[in-house]
């Protein structure tokens, strides 16, 4: 499991764990990491198993529960027992799953545009099988990534600085093992996330 462990010059005494979304890597947290270490926080930013620089097992349990257990094991191996979790998009759902599974180890939970809090079925979006999502992932191109990011992340605007993130994702989508690694980008979970929020013991932002 690839990760960054960045320690501040003037430590505040707390550790923030940053959990990336489906179309992101730990590297995309660079501005957040800089702000947090300037404020005195130690920062751990992993690439989830199946994503970016981490290993991509062909046969694996790509669930939020498993990814949470992996990340918790990483943090424990670094001697860290209590954390602040910051999760974006898919990483938001992962952060919530971690906080619910290991409640005594999370002091605060920050969810940034997390998935799972909207009832898309009620909005008319049809359910899809995991294998259908996988086939959709396999059709990804540089052009489709750029168009998706421009429309979804940048509200239609675009600057050359954004291209680096498109190239990063394109290398992952089209790299070795692309025929099966798409499975890792379709993590699944059980239960109603909104109901789970009511049972979370930590402070949520």
PLM feature spans:
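Conserved HGGG/HGGXW glycine-rich cap/lid loop of the alpha/beta-hydrolase fold
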Residues: 2-53
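Active-site loop/oxyanion-hole signature of alpha/beta-hydrolase fold enzymes
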Residues: 4-7, 38, 45-90, 94, ...
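Active-site micro-motifs of SAM-dependent methyltransferase domains
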Residues: 24, 50, 92, 116-117
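Alpha-helical elements of Rossmann-like donor-binding domains used by nucleotide-donor carbohydrate transfer enzymes
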Residues: 28-31, 66-74, 93, 97, ...
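Conserved catalytic-core motifs of eukaryotic protein kinase domains, centered on the activation segment
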Residues: 28-30, 54-60, 120-123
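Flexible "cap/lid" loop of the alpha/beta hydrolase fold
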Residues: 96-101, 107-140
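Conserved alpha/beta-hydrolase catalytic His-Asp/Glu region
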Residues: 139-199
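Catalytic His-Asp charge-relay segment
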Residues: 201-205
């Amino acid at each position: 499991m690839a990760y960054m462990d960045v320690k501040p010059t003037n430590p505040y005494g707390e550790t923030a764990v940053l959990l990336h979304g489906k179309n992101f890597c730990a590297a995309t947290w660079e501005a957040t990491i800089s702000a947090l270490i300037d404020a005195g926080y130690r920062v751990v930013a992993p690439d989830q198993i199946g994503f970016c620089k981490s290993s991509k097992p062909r046969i694996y349990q790509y669930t939020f529960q498993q990814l949470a257990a992996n990340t918790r094991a990483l943090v424990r191996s670094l001697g860290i027992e209590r954390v602040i979790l910051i999760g974006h998009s898919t990483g938001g759902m992962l952060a919530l799953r971690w906080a619910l599974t290991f409640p005594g180890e999370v002091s605060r939970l920050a969810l940034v545009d997390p998935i799972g809090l909207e009832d898309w079925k009620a909005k008319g979006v049809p359910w899809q099988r995991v294998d259908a999502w996988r086939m959709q992932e396999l059709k990804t191109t540089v052009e489709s990534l750029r168009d998706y990011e421009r429309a979804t992340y940048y509200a239609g605007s675009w600057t050359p600085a954004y291209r680096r993130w498109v190239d990063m994702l394109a290398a992952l989508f089209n790299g070795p093992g692309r025929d099966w690694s798409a499975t890792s980008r379709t993590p699944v979970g059980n239960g109603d996330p909104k109901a789970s929020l009511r049972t979370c013991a930590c402070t949520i932002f």
